[in-house]
Amino acid sequence: MRLIEKITFCIVSLLMFGSVGKVEAQSVAVRNNLLYDATLTPNLGVDLKVDSLWTLGAVVGFNAWDVDKQKNEKWRHLLVEPNVRRWLNDGVFKKSYLEGDLIYSHFNVGNTTIPFSLYDAVKEKRLQGDLFALGGKYGYSWILARHWRVEVEAGIAVGYAWFKEYECPTCGMKLGEGDRIFLLPQLGINVVYIIN
């Protein structure tokens, strides 16, 4: 089993078996980040209430296709992001929260522009590798209806990426390997459904 498969299995197992006990009203939320969808990356998050002010969760995003096949423009990746939230007001899934994240991603990008000048060389080359990061966010949740919420969140992550670099976006020989420490802004507009 590859590393990413092991990590994903562990996270899903923790979420499933961690909730085997008594499930209370409004103890599970499912969410989707609309900004992540805008990058053509389907994503899904699940949060479980573990205390009156704490939730544990995970987000998975997966982009397995090319942006433009003729140019071989791609931003393929798998992202797994376990998180913990501390709700600051009237209980979970209400008003403001602080969130801590662990982030893992396997990526294969080429002939594209990555925001914030993280990898300027990607326009002329292809990078394939992995990254780990730690992040922190502040967010706010608005109640739309009994089961529906909208969240807005912003934060920052610091991480480390290691990758193989290839000659051109579509093909080419391996040029070498590299690594990089990075700082990345985190933004989200989440549509949330609370399961009773």
Residue ranges of model-derived segments:
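Sec/Tat signal peptide C-region and signal peptidase I cleavage site
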Residues: 19-25
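Solvent-exposed loop/turn segments connecting transmembrane beta-strands
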Residues: 30-45, 63, 69-75, 92
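Flexible, solvent-exposed loop segments that connect beta-strands
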Residues: 64-77, 106-130, 162-180
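Outer-membrane beta-barrel "beta-signal"
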Residues: 84, 181-196
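Transmembrane beta-strands of outer-membrane beta-barrel pores
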Residues: 34-38, 60-66, 86, 102-108, ...
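Outer-membrane beta-barrel channels and translocator barrels
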Residues: 51-53, 89-93, 143-147, 184, ...
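Membrane-embedded beta-strand positions of outer-membrane beta-barrel proteins
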Residues: 30-32, 46, 58-60, 82, ...
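Residues that define the transmembrane beta-barrel architecture of outer-membrane proteins
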Residues: 26, 38-40, 74-80, 94, ...
